[in-house]
Amino acid sequence: MATTQAQIQRPIANFSPSLWGDQFIKNDPGAKAAEKHCKAVEELKKEVMNMITAAGSNLVEAMNLIDTLERLGISYHFEKEIDQKLKHFFNLNKDYSDESYDLYTVSLHFRLFRQHGHRISSDIFGRWIDESGKFKEGLKTDGKGLLSLYEASYLRTRGETILDDALEFATATLNSIAPHLESPLSKQVVHALIQPLHYGNPRIEAHNFISIYEENQDKNEFLLRFAKLDYNLLQMLHKEELNEVSRWWKELDLVSKLPYARDRVVECFFWAMGVYHEPQYSRARIMLTKTITMTSIIDDTYDAYGVIEELDIFTEAIERWNMEEMKKLPEYIQPFYKALLELYEQFEEELAEEGRSYAAHYAIESLKELVRSYHVEAKWFIQGYLPPFEEYLKNALITCTYCYHTTTSLLGVESAVEEDFEWLANKPKMLVAGLLICRVIDDIATYEVEKERGQSATGIESYMRDNNATIEEAVAKFFEIATDAWKDINEECLMPSPYSRDVLMRILNLERIIDVTYKGNEDGYTQPEKVLKPHIIALFVDPIKM
């Protein structure tokens, strides 16, 4: 007797519905308001350009201005000028052992140079080490300097013991003195201890810093007004894009056709915006949002609905990548398969016009690799098989989706050439580091939920069995893996590099999204209410008051 749909036992996950409904479809970004903001921003840009010029060769003044521009989220208007200044200052090879440079200043300069790829030595912090090899006790009263040191230490690479010690010292001391600091420094410290700047989403960090800068007695009113106007102007653009992808998603009607899957188009756009927020990446954001949304459905089909016979057929259909395969598929997944292939047909047509049709090819091949790995995991689950950790990790580095999302993040980036896609396809060190962070942080956040759903082949379980470890030891090891991987990413971002900084920043920013989404060991994508909702409201709903 044939098995009916009613008889099939499915691993239903019962995901929560979207928090947003049609909110962003009904939203009117306001073209007139955007035009008004645009004119004001252009005027203020001239003022800021004059400030950059006026700073001239004054190292301390110029570096403080650059830091303020970056933290207010407006530095993208002056990338060329900032890069030129930083290159000039770095080549001066300043002697930071000079007592006139305090801890705040040295830490700030170190962080800015490293953020922009300049290979400045961490030995410059040696003058604050005492005879016992520890940071001097007298620093514990310097809250501003310690915060600057704390933020700088996150740019560390492997083997930089002085920065490992700096982070440990600064973290412990800031936690101790935070309640006794005055605002706005106290607010900065509390925020930084939760979300280090280097790991944070640039737009979220800009939103936070604008409110802190407003409290600063030494604030520059021009910069503050510029930052607020620019933030609201970018928000209008992002709302337009979110409106477009929300309409696309609603027209596909996959929410009603595939009710088992997570309805997270808004959260997917949040991820895409985290990869690149600047106006010139508008098309790239829309393309990436669509690919993330479709991947989410594939993930849920393998992880939370499909049975192995169906998944065998679906895996083969993706491998063949032909519309003729649709009729072989289970009826429920046919509309999705059709929509997926049509989406990539649109991408191919659009990219062919600019001579970049190869980009779609690399994305499709990466998706096939992802689906093959999902299929392996599904078979493990059905068989109740717990693989050795090494075997688990090899497959799980692909199913974390980071490899595919990195590839598709370049679809709409015109400067991304075929060599960049080939580089990613060969799994370079920086990408592998990103895969590791994504995998272990996701595993920590989702372990308990997956265990409740009967998932045996989890990374935590595999590591615990192989190493006879407790869950606490496994989690500690996973955080250690993530920490070392971040050091590798920092190293790979330093010059000289044969690869485009535009491409490297996509990998870095995707990593930052992971840090934000899984903050506090929460799965902010599956359950966005606590972690992502406040960020989405700040970024896409509420403008900053002028």
From Swiss-Prot:
Binding of Mg(2+) 1 occurs at 299, 303
Q: Which cofactor does it need?
A: Mg(2+)
Q: Name one GO molecular function term.
A: magnesium ion binding
Q: Which GO terms describe its biological process?
A: diterpenoid biosynthetic process; sesquiterpenoid biosynthetic process
Motif DDXXD motif mapped to chain: 299-303
Per the entry, the cofactor note is:
Binds 3 Mg(2+) ions per subunit.
Name the positions where Mg(2+) 2 binds.
299, 303
Task: Name the coiled-coil region(s).
Answer: none
Q: Which UniProt keywords apply?
A: Lyase, Magnesium, Metal-binding
Report the induction information.
Answer: Induced by ethylene.
Q: Which reaction does it catalyse?
A: (2E,6E)-farnesyl diphosphate = (-)-5-epi-eremophilene + diphosphate
Instruction: Name the Gene3D superfamilies on file.
Output: Farnesyl Diphosphate Synthase, Terpene synthase, N-terminal domain
The pathway that the record names for this protein is:
Secondary metabolite biosynthesis; terpenoid biosynthesis
Tissues showing expression: Highly expressed in leaves and at lower levels in flowers.
Supply the enzyme class, top level: lyase
Q: How does it assemble?
A: Monomer.
Q: What domain comment accompanies this record?
A: The Asp-Asp-Xaa-Xaa-Asp/Glu (DDXXD/E) motif is important for the catalytic activity, presumably through binding to Mg(2+).
Q: What is this protein called?
A: (-)-5-epieremophilene synthase STPS1
| Species of the source | Salvia miltiorrhiza
Give me the gene this protein comes from.
STPS1
